[in-house]
Amino acid sequence: MTRKLKVAIIGSGNIGTDLMIKVLRHGGPIEMGAMVGIDPGSDGLARAARLGVPTTAEGLEGLLRLPGFKDIGLVFDATSAGAHHRHAARLAELGVPMIDLTPAAIGPYVVPVVNGEAHRGARNINMVTCGGQATIPIVAAVSQVARVHYAEIVASIASRSAGPGTRANIDEFTETTSRAIEAVGGAERGKAIIILNPAEPPLMMRDTVFTFSAPASESEVEASIEAMVAKVQAYVSGYRLKQRVQFEHTEVALPGAGRVRGLKTTVLLEVRGAAHYLPEYAGNLDIMTSAALACAQAQAAALIAA
């Protein structure tokens, strides 16, 4: 029988529940060991129980008391930035690695197609944000061709897809995404904006990426972006370019550098969710959980092969 790594998910909200269903359906080398929440009436805990997953509504302490905790080899945290600091401290004492889906960013930022391999052995990795997972690959693709002086992303998500955790973390979202645009995407300066779109019926997740780089070949930049999109599609099938990449050779004022001539690149993206738990318009959740699943599968495969 093939050995699998048992995982626990802390957080029975939208992200945690969607991730659980992905693990149950497409886990590969990982399997569910526990679903953890703090609301006994949450739909996520109810679904987990119906699907035969051990559950607790007593948070981290409840997880530690579960008979099967000793077999848990990896924990996903889909709660909040503040809660993750507490969870990480306790689980680090017990030697249990974590994948952090909050903006806490205790560990390194990880975007699977950009730097997943480099951090495969880390004990705590951070999945940035939904906007970061969607847009940082594009910034990195431009960075592979030319020096990126500035990158700005605008993530527009359906208001209905934003649960209480997302709403509570708006400030952390912008700060974490901005830092990761620089640290992972390779931009010298990054900025992130999130928009909760109240439109009805809800619209798909849309992301706009602007970069200003050193002069470069438009065809090389476009080819790099298209190759990166294909890599992301390997684990997020609903990820696509909304239209062809747009370019403008222009001159802008950069802080400390004066007027600089370069290439402005504009990329419009759409992320359609897989509808494992929430509707297709919740691509913002799908890309986070899909990226986290990809990282967990890579870590599990490495551990099992060791």
UniProtKB/Swiss-Prot annotation:
Superkingdom assignment: Bacteria
Reactions listed under catalytic activity: acetaldehyde + NAD(+) + CoA = acetyl-CoA + NADH + H(+)
Transmembrane found in the keyword field: no
Bilayer-crossing regions: none
Gene3D superfamilies in UniProt: Dihydrodipicolinate Reductase, domain 2, NAD(P)-binding Rossmann-like Domain
Similarity field: Belongs to the acetaldehyde dehydrogenase family.
Protein name per its UniProtKB record: Acetaldehyde dehydrogenase
Organism, scientific name: Ralstonia nicotianae (strain ATCC BAA-1114 / GMI1000)
Gene this protein is translated from: dmpF
